[in-house]
């Protein structure tokens, strides 16, 4: 499956804001976007006025890259969100938030979504007692995500309590770093997603 393999900080610079792709590094002065807050390339400093379509496209790319989802997957999520009851944009964000890799990241067991995806693929987590290794798997209220006993000495996992204390945990999740597990308490709401996203632009883009 194709994945973006170049410097991830370039993606933040391309979108003109932090996407927090590299986890804790994004909160330090080592963040590339902090040092060079303009698009990569020779003409990066000269941002042109964008058309409505370009603005919609950039918003879609921003969200897709933030969650580390491929274009085909993202379009599939939109179609699914559009067929659900409620507001399509909010439904889309809920589907992205309840991916297993994002849940692992939100619980503090990884420094970034990319790292969470890798850890899930290595099969170090269980969901309701069963080993899982599919990052795109969705979680629901009542699900318990736990680190397998033999994987608890992995440095990033061992530091989970510290990460949770520093970063916090969204209200729809309950993290128990001391016991290397977390529980899904409810489905995430739009208010649970603090990152500045204008999902209506994405809806308008796919509605053309």
Curated annotation (Swiss-Prot):
The keyword rRNA-binding applies. Keywords: Ribonucleoprotein, Ribosomal protein, RNA-binding, rRNA-binding. One of its GO terms (biological process) is translation. Pfam families: Ribosomal_S4, S4. The keyword Methyltransferase does not apply. Residues 98-161 form the S4 RNA-binding domain. SMART domains: Ribosomal_S4, S4. Disulfide bonds: none annotated. GO terms for cellular component: small ribosomal subunit. Gene3D superfamilies: Ribosomal Protein S4 Delta 41, Chain A, domain 1, RNA-binding S4 domain. Part of the 30S ribosomal subunit. Contacts protein S5. The interaction surface between S4 and S5 is involved in control of translational fidelity. HAMAP family: Ribosomal_uS4_B (MF_01306_B). This is Small ribosomal subunit protein uS4. It comes from Maridesulfovibrio salexigens (strain ATCC 14822 / DSM 2638 / NCIMB 8403 / VKM B-1763).
């Amino acid at each position: 499956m194709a994945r973006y393999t170049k410097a991830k900080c370039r993606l933040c610079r391309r979108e003109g804001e932090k996407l927090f792709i590299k986890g804790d590094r994004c909160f330090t002065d080592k963040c590339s976007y902090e040092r060079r807050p303009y698009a990569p390339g020779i003409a990066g400093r000269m941002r042109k006025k964008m058309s409505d379509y370009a603005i919609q496209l950039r918003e879609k790319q921003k969200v897709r890259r933030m969650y580390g989802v491929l274009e085909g997957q993202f379009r599939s999520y939109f179609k699914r969100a559009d067929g659900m009851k409620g507001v399509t944009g909010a439904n889309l964000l809920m589907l992205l938030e309840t991916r297993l890799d994002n849940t692992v990241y939100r619980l503090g067991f990884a420094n970034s979504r990319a790292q969470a995806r890798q850890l899930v693929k290595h099969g170090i987590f269980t969901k309701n007692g069963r080993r899982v290794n599919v990052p795109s798997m969705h979680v629901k209220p009542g699900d318990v995500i736990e680190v397998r006993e033999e994987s608890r000495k992995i440095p990033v996992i061992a530091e989970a309590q510290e990460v949770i204390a520093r970063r916090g945990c969204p209200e729809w999740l309950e993290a128990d770093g001391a016991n290397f597990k977390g529980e899904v308490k409810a489905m995430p709401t739009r208010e649970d997603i603090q990152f500045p996203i204008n999902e209506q632009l994405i809806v308008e883009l796919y509605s053309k």
